[in-house]
């Protein structure tokens, strides 16, 4: 609002009862509930030209309408028909050409997305061509076909060269992108973008100082089951975390790739049904920048999963992170799915690992990771996934103990979140290291410091492995290319030889930091 107030409106598919909004006057740190008339403008955007507030709304069979104030929020409003066909997930207006163009992204109809464009401050509108992406066809690790909903939930930003950039949700492994050179009236053929993300909504925007910021789920779901026929999604398995990245050069390079928030319900045995069997998880985000570099974001679906989060963009430039389990498993993804789809496209979960008291240090915990056979689970492979700032040249260190009989453990360095139980990570990860005594040259039950050093800008140079500072003969090839560096470690625990139940791998501390290019 002009006086600095932030408002978060209560409306839409999962709105609480009543007509109200949340108000903050301290840049999103504290909020209070304010009751409001039902006919009050909601989450409208102020025109840079006139200051009037504008919003496009879907009236389903009646089509799309523009609601525009006359004299600001307390004045009158005009309602103008924009389209005779309804649209879904209509986004707030984006301004281009120094505010002279309003662009509103939406989707509907032909399993595609498009934009509405106004060059007269929201009085009249034109609709662009429809952007359509190819269907998911299965194959590879998939036994079925992902929900082929087409290109939907687009997000748009103006680039410094005048083009508009659209990123969209699709059923593929990565978000697709398209570009417009005429202010959003026509869009190019879509292509795969650099950003991983499947059946989740992206959000991009420009900050006050010109930087771009991107919110999305940098995640890959489990391979599709044979029951998935492409008509509807049977279960969502990649909506447990929202990520953020930032660009200083108009989208050419990106930094961060940080987990903004992990779903606090992610390990719950009644995950699928608690609070009602409706959409849930951490996908979908909106943001504002009340002060330069200070971001307030609303993320997630479902009252028990969504949250308002405030952060400083400096956090996205950090180049190291550590964890010693002093916060328990707060920063880790460790769940397994229980068989049986419940509620709206969900599985219930269990925590697939254990925290145990450190045998040598009072008050400290260690992670115990071992395979444990369980027919009740979608997959009984156990895993632990941890995020750190994306590093093109980096070093990952873990203090580990491999007791006699520890088998079936693998460490994957990756550029995205994958399910803890997903062994596809061994094939699609960037660097893969078997964690065996023989491989690492470990001959006792003591704690050892394992280090891996990499440089993704020199793919012919294999990653170096050290144990207790001593370089091992083993070198890790780059198994797959990465656009933005390594930002995840993924520990896997699979059955031992002859399907035996092996001893656990113990982890007491992990750390990642940037290295200088070689």
Regions found by a protein language model. Give the residues of each.
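Extracellular beta-strand elements of beta-rich domains used
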Residues: 325, 505-512
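Flexible glycan-contacting loops in extracellular carbohydrate-active proteins
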Residues: 474-508
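Asp-box/BNR beta-propeller blade signature and adjacent active/binding-site loops
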Residues: 1-329, 338-341, 352-355, 373-375, ...
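Short, aromatic/His-centered strand-loop micro-motif at the edge of beta-sheets
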Residues: 429-451
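Short tryptophan-centered beta-strand motifs in secreted/extracellular beta-sheet-rich domains
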Residues: 398, 446-457, 463-465
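Secretory/extracellular carbohydrate-interaction modules
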Residues: 362-436
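Extracellular glycan-recognition surfaces and repeat-rich motifs
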Residues: 330-369
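Beta-strand-rich interaction surfaces with strong enrichment in secreted/lumenal proteins
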Residues: 191, 382-388, 435-442, 478, ...
């Amino acid at each position: 609002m002009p006086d600095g107030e932030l408002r978060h409106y209560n409306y839409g598919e999962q709105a609480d009862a009543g007509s109200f909004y949340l108000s903050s006057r301290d840049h999103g740190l504290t909020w209070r509930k304010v009751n409001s008339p039902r006919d009050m403008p909601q989450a409208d955007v102020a025109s840079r030209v006139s200051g009037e507030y504008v919003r496009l709304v879907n009236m389903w069979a009646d089509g799309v309408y523009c609601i525009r104030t006359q004299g600001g929020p307390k004045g009158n409003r005009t309602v103008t028909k924009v389209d005779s066909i309804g649209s879904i997930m209509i986004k707030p207006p984006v301004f281009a050409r120094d505010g002279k163009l309003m662009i509103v992204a939406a989707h509907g109809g032909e399993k595609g997305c498009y934009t509405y464009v106004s060059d007269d401050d929201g009085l009249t509108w034109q609709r662009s061509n429809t952007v359509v992406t190819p269907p998911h066809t299965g194959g590879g690790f998939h036994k079925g076909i992902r929900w082929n909903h087409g290109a939907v939930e687009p997000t748009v930003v103006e680039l410094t060269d005048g083009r508009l950039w659209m990123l969209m949700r699709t059923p593929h492994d990565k978000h697709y992108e398209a570009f417009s050179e005429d202010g959003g009236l026509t869009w190019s053929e879509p292509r795969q973008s650099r950003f991983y993300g499947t059946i989740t909504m992206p959000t991009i925007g420009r900050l006050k100082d010109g930087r771009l910021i991107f919110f999305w789920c940098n995640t890959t779901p489990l391979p599709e089951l044979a029951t998935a026929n492409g008509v509807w999604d049977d279960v969502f398995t990649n909506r447990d975390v929202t990520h953020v990245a930032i660009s200083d050069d108009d989208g050419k390079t990106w930094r961060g790739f940080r987990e903004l928030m992990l779903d606090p319900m992610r390990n719950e045995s009644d995950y699928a049904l608690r609070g009602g069997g409706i959409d849930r998880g951490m996908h979908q985000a909106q943001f504002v920048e009340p002060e330069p570099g200070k971001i307030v974001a609303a993320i997630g679906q479902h009252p028990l999963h969504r949250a308002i989060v405030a952060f400083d963009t400096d956090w996205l430039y950090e180049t190291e992170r550590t964890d010693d389990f002093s916060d328990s498993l707060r920063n880790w993804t460790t769940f397994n799915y229980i068989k049986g789809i419940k509620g709206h496209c969900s599985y219930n979960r269990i925590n697939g690992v254990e925290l145990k008291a450190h045998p040598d240090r009072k008050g400290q915990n260690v992670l115990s990771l071992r395979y444990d056979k369980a027919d009740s689970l979608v997959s009984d492979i156990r895993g632990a996934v941890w995020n750190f700032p994306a590093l093109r040249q980096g070093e990952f260190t873990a203090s580990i103990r491999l007791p006699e009989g520890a088998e079936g453990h693998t460490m994957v360095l990756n550029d995205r979140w994958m399910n803890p139980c997903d062994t596809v990570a061994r094939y699609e990860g960037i660097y893969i290291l078997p964690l065996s005594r023989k491989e690492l040259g470990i001959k006792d039950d003591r704690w050892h410091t394992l280090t891996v050093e990499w440089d993704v800008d020199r793919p012919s140079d294999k990653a170096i492995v050290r144990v207790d500072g001593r370089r091992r003969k083993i070198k890790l090839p780059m198994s797959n290319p990465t656009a933005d560096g390594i930002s995840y470690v993924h520990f896997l625990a699979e059955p031992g030889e002859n399907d035996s139940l092996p001893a656990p791998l113990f982890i007491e501390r992990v750390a990642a930091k940037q290295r200088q290019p070689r």
